[in-house]
Amino acid sequence: MDKFRMMFQFLQSNQESFMNGICGIMALASAQMYSSFEFSCPCMPEYNYTYGIGLLIIPPIWFFLLGFVLNNNVSVLAEEWKRPTGRRTKDPSVLRYMLCSITQRSLIAPAVWVSVTLMDGKSFLCAFSINLDIEKFGNASLVIGMTETEKLKFLARIPCKDLFEDNEVRVAATRYIKCISQACGWMFLLMMTFTAFLIRAIRPCFTQAAFLKTKYWSHYIDIERKMFDETCKEHAKSFAKVCIHQYFENISGEMQNFHRHQSKDTSDAEEEEKQRSDEDKLLGIKAQEDMNKVLWNWHTCKPALALRKDHLDTESNGKLNGTMNGAVNGFAQGHTHDVAKKEWAVYYSKV
């Protein structure tokens, strides 16, 4: 249990590893679902093609959408795309990078499903059995004298072992279609692998600085959202604690005053210190209207990404070094006459 908890905490702290683990689980789940899936071809010319192609296309679409649902970055991408510009501009390249990253992970499980389905060949056999030329597999007398409708019904029963009478023709047709299906499966795997290789190989050929920039700011957007959520949780926790504490103080004020007279000064100091620390965590926001305004301003007008040093520190450093704003401040001793000069003492050890 402890190992599972440690692994879960690691995955939570490392978003990329967590999403890679989710993609791997989805890929294994898709293969396991197909192996446990009971394939039942309708063996009717009106429904064979729909059933076979639907089995090849619909589950991958479901896995693809499920990959988007399980990816936490989808909400981050949507919020970043729809948010007002405010004082922070939106970079389309960062949004494209986030969308491509989400799409790549979501395509893993559908690719596994399509590959397993094509390698198995059952859906391919069900979809294209009515297009076979039965004369290529011997015993063409089976379809002699049949109308076109009867011939289609006859060919549609090839995937169904219990409904098709001539076993040799059925086995030959099944092997033929499964051979084509497996060839398509290997071509699909080759195409997917070659595409991934091209993406890996071509990326360094372009401007690496632009790629690093988009990667950095996409990570920043994700981390900023997490830090904002954590800060809001801590603020809400402190706000609730102070609010409840004040409520009980107002309700039982006389009783608390009675106990305070009997308690020690150390306990009073500790309680005041705890209450002061909780109030400090509120960061000066102590009303519901103020908090709503802060949250609204965060959504409508996020602060610009331009961190500056404290003006007071810069000014003090300038006075100390005899410079102001990167230039000499004009005073011979590096300070004004009305500002007390700092004394420096140097001690030398003879040890």
UniProtKB/Swiss-Prot annotation:
Subcellular location(s) of the protein: Cell membrane; Endoplasmic reticulum membrane; Basolateral cell membrane
Topology feature Cytoplasmic, residues: 1-20, 72-98, 204-351
Glycosylated residues (UniProt): N139
Chain intervals for the UniProt region annotation (Phospholipid-binding): 62-69, 104-116, 189-199
Pfam families documented for this protein: Ca_hom_mod
Transmembrane segments: 21-36, 49-71, 99-124, 178-203
Family: Belongs to the CALHM family.
Presence of keyword Transmembrane: yes
InterPro entries, A to Z: CALHM (IPR029569)
Superkingdom of the organism of origin: Eukaryota
Subunit and interaction comment: Oligomerizes to form hexamers and octamers. Does not form gap junctions. Associates with CALHM3 as a pore-forming subunit in a hetero-hexameric channel complex.
Domain remark from Swiss-Prot or TrEMBL: A phospholipid-binding pocket is formed between conserved regions of S3 and S4 helices of one subunit and S2 of the adjacent subunit. It may regulate channel assembly and gating.
Chain intervals for the UniProt region annotation (Central pore): 9-36
Reactions catalysed according to its record: ATP(in) = ATP(out); Ca(2+)(in) = Ca(2+)(out); Mg(2+)(in) = Mg(2+)(out); Na(+)(in) = Na(+)(out)
Covalent lipid sites (S-palmitoyl cysteine): C100, C205
Disulfide bond sites: C41-C126, C43-C160
PTM statement from Swiss-Prot or TrEMBL: N-glycosylated. Palmitoylated.
Extracellular domain ranges by topology: 37-48, 125-177
Species per Swiss-Prot/TrEMBL record: Oryzias latipes
Regulation: Activated in response to membrane depolarization and low extracellular Ca(2+) concentration. Inhibited by ruthenium red.
Keywords: Calcium, Calcium channel, Calcium transport, Cell membrane, Disulfide bond, Endoplasmic reticulum, Glycoprotein, Ion channel, Ion transport, Lipoprotein, Membrane, Palmitate, Transmembrane, Transmembrane helix, Transport
Protein name stated in the entry: Calcium homeostasis modulator 1
Composition bias, Basic and acidic residues: 263-281
Function comment: Pore-forming subunit of a voltage-gated ion channel. Has poor ion selectivity and forms a wide pore that mediates permeation of small ions including Ca(2+), Na(+), K(+) and Cl(-), as well as larger ions such as ATP(4-).
